Amino acid sequence: MTAEQTTSPSPATESRAATDRPDGTPHDPYLWLEEVEGDEALAWVRARNAEVADTLETADEFAATERAIREVLDSDAKIPEVSKIGDRYYNFWRDAQHERGVWRRTTLESYRTDDPEWETVLDLDALAAAEGESWVWHGASVLRPTPEQLAAGEPWRHALVELSPGGSDADVTREFDLVEKRFVAPEDGGFHRAEAKGSLGWIDADTVYVFTDFGEGTLTPSGYPRVVKRWTRGTPLDAAVTVYEGTDEDMYISAWRSHTPGFERDFVHRSKAFYSDELYLAERTGTPEQRLTKIDVPDSAEVGVRREWLLVELRDDWTVGGATYRAGSLLAARFDDFLAGDRGFTVLFEPTATTSLAGATWTRHHLVVNVLDDVKNRLHVLTPPDAAAPGGAVGQEAADAPWVRSEIPGLPALGTVAVGAVDPVDTDDLWLVTTDYLTPTTLSLLSLGEHPGDAGAPEVVKSNPAFFDADGMTVAQHFATSDDGTRVPYFVVGRADLVAGAGEGGSGTGTAPTLLYGYGGFEISLTPAYSGALGRAWLSQGGVYVVANIRGGGEYGPAWHQAALKANRHRAYEDFAAVARDLVARGITTPEHLGMEGRSNGGLLAGNMLTQYPELFGAVIVGVPLLDMRRYTKLLAGASWAAEYGDPDDPEQWEFIRTFSPYHLFDAEREYPPVLFTTSTKDDRVHPGHARKLAAKMLGEGKDVTYYENIEGGHGGAANNAQAAHMAAVHYRFLAERLG
């Protein structure tokens, strides 16, 4: 039963007088829903949420689904991920007893046991209760003591804790004492940054970089900091010294210090647009000013400096120093030599037709390169000349001894492998996280040793429990053919008979309830990962889960992403539609039993599947979406995404943007599958008005629309496990009822 069948007329269908604006653009009759916390808008939201409570949430299955998911999220058996700070290992943890979460620490010896002894550092539930705030943890940064302080036995003391009210991107930063386990009040000289988008970063124990909202004119059009300052303890914020000021057109300005002993350096980062950045070396001159030296690489490149090395990851081809380097390559040069004018590079990675760079992680002596090969991870250890023993050279020699390649033994052939350095300043230890759709996540500890080939076998430290019975289930990877002939990979997960389909010897019925998920933007790759919630609420109930690796993502490097930018956005949607058709052609499901879901940029994908390909789906979930592409640059952080979608205020660009703006593509005369819109009032990244307005427009035309908006949660949708379980249950029950 749909919402419009169970409720009387309400603001859900109310539009306002339609008159054109002075600039000629059509009036938006649902503009009032952009008032995030306006009385009328919130009344509309509450009415929609009440409809969900009266329909989806009343079924017995809803409570069971919510409970099953909550058990996964609250499980004490989950892997507690840790970060090494000094000789302790810190973890932030949520469970049934710690709804907001607890920041805690232990030793490595204790962490290796089945039941570690945790020392509470900060109880967020107690803090929220004491201060009357719905605090959501945004993380902490800790100042590394100097070598002299460490030699004298001084502890790691100075932390900067970031907390968000309700889960918004805007947060506060407060200084915290790790020894005394308390906040350092501003009246006691503690650093405190008021709520805004921005941050603080340690320079030394009495100085920080601050980039935040300093008042009128100090934010970019995207709502991010435009000014970075150096702030001294005990002085007012307005006395902080400006280090760098961006332009009115920039996206984000920030600064930080690298505290690696012997390689202490300061940097200023200028983000001009989403894929256009500048990095400056900031050197003290003995005056309040700092001398800035631009790192002379393409603005489209990703740049990193570690100890004596400069790493450059290319998004575009680059000709320099008499050589041309391909987009997607990873280059290395000695940083000081580069600053002196040397443009010789060593190629550490060069992409192929099936491979792309997923990441590069430094340890004390090595660089671990993570490569995706047809969306499967492969790891390589590269050792720079100063630490290398004789062995096979990597890439091209650049007036220097070669880097040396070695391999990590004992890794799975399939699935996802994520890499994290335990302590990149002092050790060559690695955390390895391995996972796939049906295998619970495992955390291993690996010591690479100082020299190539010294690595031992990974030591399994923690494993998640099996939250669902995967016996009889399987994972398959297939390729669909898009409209222009491009092969698009996708993974299918579920019972073996259902995954096999009804054709070519398969024993399936061809009508399996199937959820197809995608994203397709911002260079983000979708790789296999275990989800206890998905397994319990969908796979164990006979559902099939599919992940489409469409263009716009990062699965095959920069070219794969750039193929779906701006005027070519339609390629991402054609890819997704091709996967949907391939699932039907393989006899796995039918359009009536095929649902799809996308969030954020994936919500834009979902909106386009809904409005451009409604015949392919039996249900659509549109989560925290962009939908009104005429106004997206004017809403919250939207201006920062013009490099991805284009500028709707440019008439020529609007001509192609309008072809993927679901709010404008909706046609009251067309038939659409049932749709669920979800968002959060506290989302200050993607405006909740996107979801509100299209839902209202469709409800006004009598379409089958379900709408749920969490009052907290930010762009992630939920502020705690209870909210996350509830939101997920809404999703799965909607799909179960619509897809059969």
What feature does the model see in each segment?
Residues 1-429, 435-439, 445-446, 454-455, ...:
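Beta-propeller folds
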Residues 126-147, 155, 163-168, 182, ...:
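Cap/lid segment of the alpha/beta-hydrolase catalytic domain
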